């Protein structure tokens, strides 16, 4: 599974309240949630992400409240993958279950810049920046990879039954 897109870059400790503020949790439509993704940090995020982007972030991306809507909103907004130095465990699994690839890369925010063109091999974790710089992140394998390839946990379970 290869993903390529330009980078939107964020720092450390991007919590789920930033990803999708609590006032929107009563809504279930992914497209509506997408319009409010990252709103407290970047009100223009939806416009920037809609063409398809890869988020690069620092430590503990997705920390805070456990809300599946965070991964759902990012994916619906146009986020193709997230590369971060570390992820909150629950967010990591919610992302996989929603079909949103998440790759861990040490020093991600030092190695990759805003606007860089990045190609990610989700299985191997290889990341190519601007066609030349090669980085090695942690790939995804086994059942989590199968879930991603099928588009998320619900699709995976439907195909398995």
Curated annotation (Swiss-Prot):
Its EC number is 4.2.1.33. Catalyzes the isomerization between 2-isopropylmalate and 3-isopropylmalate, via the formation of 2-isopropylmaleate. GO terms for molecular function: 3-isopropylmalate dehydratase activity. PANTHER family: 3-ISOPROPYLMALATE DEHYDRATASE SMALL SUBUNIT 1, 3-ISOPROPYLMALATE DEHYDRATASE SMALL SUBUNIT 2-RELATED-RELATED. The keyword Lyase applies. It holds the Pfam family Aconitase_C. Belongs to the LeuD family. LeuD type 2 subfamily. Heterodimer of LeuC and LeuD. Keywords: Amino-acid biosynthesis, Branched-chain amino acid biosynthesis, Leucine biosynthesis, Lyase. InterPro entries: Aconitase/3IPM_dehydase_swvl, AconitaseA/IPMdHydase_ssu_swvl, IPMI_Swivel, LeuD, LeuD_type2/HacB/DmdB. It comes from Sulfolobus acidocaldarius (strain ATCC 33909 / DSM 639 / JCM 8929 / NBRC 15157 / NCIMB 11770). GO terms for biological process: L-leucine biosynthetic process. Pathway: Amino-acid biosynthesis; L-leucine biosynthesis; L-leucine from 3-methyl-2-oxobutanoate: step 2/4. This is 3-isopropylmalate dehydratase small subunit. It catalyses: (2R,3S)-3-isopropylmalate = (2S)-2-isopropylmalate. The gene is leuD.
């Amino acid at each position: 599974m290869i993903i390529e897109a330009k980078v939107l870059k964020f720092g450390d400790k991007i919590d789920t309240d930033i990803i999708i503020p609590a006032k929107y949790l009563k809504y279930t439509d992914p497209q509506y949630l997408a319009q409010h993704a990252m709103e407290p940090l970047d009100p223009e995020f939806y416009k920037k992400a809609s063409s398809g982007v890869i988020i690069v972030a620092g430590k503990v991306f997705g920390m805070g409240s456990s809300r599946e809507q965070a991964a759902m909103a990012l994916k619906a907004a146009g986020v193709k993958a997230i590369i971060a130095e570390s992820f909150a465990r629950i967010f990591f699994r919610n992302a996989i279950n929603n079909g949103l690839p998440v790759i861990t890369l040490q020093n991600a925010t030092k190695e990759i810049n805003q606007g860089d063109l990045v190609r990610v091999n989700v299985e191997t974790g290889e990341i190519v920046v601007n066609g030349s710089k090669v980085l090695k992140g942690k790939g995804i394998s086994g059942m989590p990879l199968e879930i991603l390839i099928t588009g998320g946990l619900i699709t995976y379970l439907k195909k398995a039954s």
